[in-house]
Amino acid sequence: MIHACSVATKSSFSEFMLLKRSIELFHDVSWTISCDPYASNELSKFSNVRVLNLIESDEGCSHGTDDKEKTRRFTELAMTKFNAVEDSIDRNGYGLFFDSDIIFANPIDERVVELLNDEKIDAVLCPHMTNNLGLEAQVGHYNTGLFSLRSKSMLKTHVFLSSNPENGFYTDQQAIQFAAYEHTVLNLPINYNIGWWRFNERHTAPRLELLHIDDGKIKFGNLDAVCFHVHTLKKLDYKNYGQFLLDKILGLMDNSKNEKYYEIAKMIRGIN
């Protein structure tokens, strides 16, 4: 059983349902979700979802624009993920958080599942792996679209630093880097949380060619491509920098001869 957490609202609901369906093609999952009223009503139908009614509305929220008010509202909404993670820690020992715009293509490795349940591991984190150290000095070493926490001490530090942007931290992404300094953490390899930023430099763009189909599965080099981090169904008020990656994923799925991928591709394209 995977104990997963996320945030779901009216505008992100279709993407969350894609995340939910894609991971459940490979794992049994119990969910703890921070919701607005729309998502709460829809998700209450599922026996494996615990709903936390923490969000009034997602209107006027965005983190991809220069609008300070939209960014403030988005940050306020995003902070509720810590409530979901803490609730899961209390009930399950850990909380594995996913942004709603994550798509699973292969199961989580059994070794990672074991380590999620290992009481000696305080957190499981995903480095950005941009190979651009100057950029990561600004935005943070880790991407917080996928992380797991077991340590409530680390959670509290993460929340404190994320709640105080006047300290100079880049929301929760840089904050989790500093929170990790005093804890035992596991870094996930490059085949997890595969986002557009891993292909965004001249010297990293060739990585895209490492994505291929082998025996009906999407591979990243020699590794199974476990999950991708890319917007699919949510209407954005900024450029979708990951469109090239989404196009690549769909092309691979279309040619995979894998029924699970056909189902995921249909959901991405909005086909029932």
Mark where each language-model region is.
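Short, hydrophobic beta-strand segments that form beta-sheet elements in well-ordered domains
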Residues: 30-37, 123-126, 228
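Extracytoplasmic beta-rich repeat domains
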Residues: 73-74
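Amphipathic alpha-helical segments that form well-ordered structural scaffolds
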Residues: 18, 22, 26, 84, ...
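Catalytic core and acceptor-binding pocket of nucleotide-sugar-dependent glycosyltransferases
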Residues: 144-240
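Short, solvent-exposed loop/turn segments at secondary-structure junctions
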Residues: 11-12, 38-40, 57-59, 102-104, ...
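GT-A fold catalytic core of metal-dependent nucleotide-sugar glycosyltransferases
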Residues: 77-131
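A recurrent flexible, glycine/aromatic-enriched loop bordering the glycosyltransferase active site
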Residues: 133-146
